[in-house]
């Protein structure tokens, strides 16, 4: 700015040093030295150029000179007009011309100079031209050092950037400068742009060098991402990289797009590892049993979608049977997942847990099926045995335990109580109960409609006691296998029918596993066997009679009730006796009378003597 130095006349007539900042039509914008006055516009007639620096200083007595001095301590020094009165060596006595009163002062030679002969400036004293600056170069043009060479080339007094007009201002005292500016301005701007680019690259290289030196001793990790997963790793508009760079402690992240290599530098291992978690995308697969694929996917994909959402994986794919990209195991289907390493670990945990749960549920289901199959097998044997028909939910084994078999007195007592209730009940009650029994009786439990008591339906007269009496030499096993009446001795129609009704109300069920032939043996601790080694019907009745005689309960209290009950039962069921007990023809009765044995005669005698007892005891099963 020394070349644009001017002298501005103050109000006291002295000239003060200043600098031109801008040129206007009729004034100059001047900045004063040391800013002792604010910047202001000064008219041309109050501004002059300083004298040349190489002027010869020849001063003698009586010459007019200019003295560099100040009026007071608050003002800076300026050039005052004076006159030399006396000279003595290096000292000069001067007299100020601006003061009314004579004011003398002794000064040295350095503070004196000849009177400035330059006139005040005019409009054509200074020339100004402007150059528009592109937006990308405005910041660079604000530095005046960038125009040093250009200023020298064009001969300008001053070159500066004006931010309000975004123009480059060139001030000069020569008109030739304007022409040179028009020639060199474009070249100057290109050179600024080139230098700016080179400077920027140099700065980046310097920063990279410094960063590399710092990172050499810091933590860093390097990993490769597959090319088809590079888009996921970078993220939308580089969001993943930006997120990784925001991790506290991460200093730099570098990406080699050609090889897909990421390099992460940080101040700590944890920071580098955390940043890597945002960028490292991988693809992995999990084997799922083929029979569980549908349950893993769920209805409308609900289960697999929940697993994907909770784990954070990007996508999932099920490899088809015709694809052989991944290794397969027998009975397994690969599920392929894509995501960060953390999300892949999460989905592996979720899927393995769900598969283990499904396997456990399947195992429990199979165990239940096995149990149900065993129950069906057991139930099929129970249902098909002896023509008993189906049992209700409260069914228990009719034979009971060994203790029940060895103590028949308990069931005998229960039967007596039932008979007592029958005898004491009114006629209406008995009639209604008879109607209910008659509705249940025709089919019976596991019996045919005709009243036959054998398994699988009626067998005619062969299932009755009369058939046995007709043929004493026949095999008694057939009777025990095919009827339920082998536990009783039905000697006549009334007695058999009466005992049948009682057995329906209270009798102990037999299991299908009990031996039919030994049923008669278990009714008494001392079973009698005839000379052929077989148990006959007469022996069975004899045992029942002997057991009844051993009972300790008093029979007198129930004798009357038993007689009435037996009589009522015989009268009520008289018409159906023939149908129940077997053959109804007279020829059949005659044959049975002719073929009676001494054992059967004994049975009839016992029946007549103990009619009431036989009605109760012969029904024990």
From Swiss-Prot:
UniProt subcellular location: Cytoplasm, Cytoplasmic ribonucleoprotein granule; Cytoplasm, Stress granule; Cytoplasm; Cell projection, Dendrite
Native species: Homo sapiens
UniProt keyword annotation of Hydrolase present: no
Annotated Gene Ontology cellular component terms: axon; costamere; cytoplasm; cytoplasmic ribonucleoprotein granule; cytoplasmic stress granule; cytosol; dendritic spine; glutamatergic synapse
GO terms (BP aspect): animal organ development; apoptotic process; dentate gyrus development; membraneless organelle assembly; mRNA destabilization; mRNA transport; muscle organ development; negative regulation of inflammatory response
Record domain Agenet-like: where: 4-50, 63-115
Gene behind this protein: FXR1
Protein name: RNA-binding protein FXR1
Domain KH span(s) in chain numbering: 222-251, 285-314
Bias type Basic residues, positions: 499-509
Primary localization class, coarse: cytoplasm
Domain of life: Eukaryota
Biased composition (Acidic residues): 483-493
